[in-house]
Amino acid sequence: VLKVRPDLQVLLTDVDTSLHMNNGRYWTLMDHGRADIMIRSGLWRAIVKRGWVPVVSAGQIRFRREMKLFQAFVLETRILTWSEGHVVMEHRLLSKARDGKPVLNAIALVRAGLYDRRERRYVPMSRLLEEIGLEAEPPQASPEVEAFLRAEETLKSAA
């Protein structure tokens, strides 16, 4: 499963009045992680050519450790599993402790898909895989992913 891992740093534009990363900035960085996967996989060409629109339908985040101004970190983005029209992705923001050991600052799960405006539906995963020349079956969803998807369905029915 494709995974991207760019090196980043908390900048002045990322922080709030406490000089740690603003909660909303995490989501923006995760948008960049998803775009990075689309570009590196070659899917971006098809997205532009066919007028597909990336859409996030659900997300859940757990903040574990604050990220301070100028702190270096890595954003890991990977696809965990998929259904017919959506993928579930994991985003992990990791920094290093003083002893060099990795620190998990935040972790998020996101459900997303590519919407075809002409067809008025989400693009099937089989079509997306075909566009990038892959054949694959979705990995088994972990208990955490299953719980996330159940919670998303519950919220969806309440809306």
Regions found by a protein language model. Give the residues of each.
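Generic structural detector for well-ordered beta-strands
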Residues: 7-11, 62, 111-113
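Short structured motifs
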Residues: 57-63, 75
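Short N-terminal edge-element motif at the start of the domain
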Residues: 46-53, 69-71
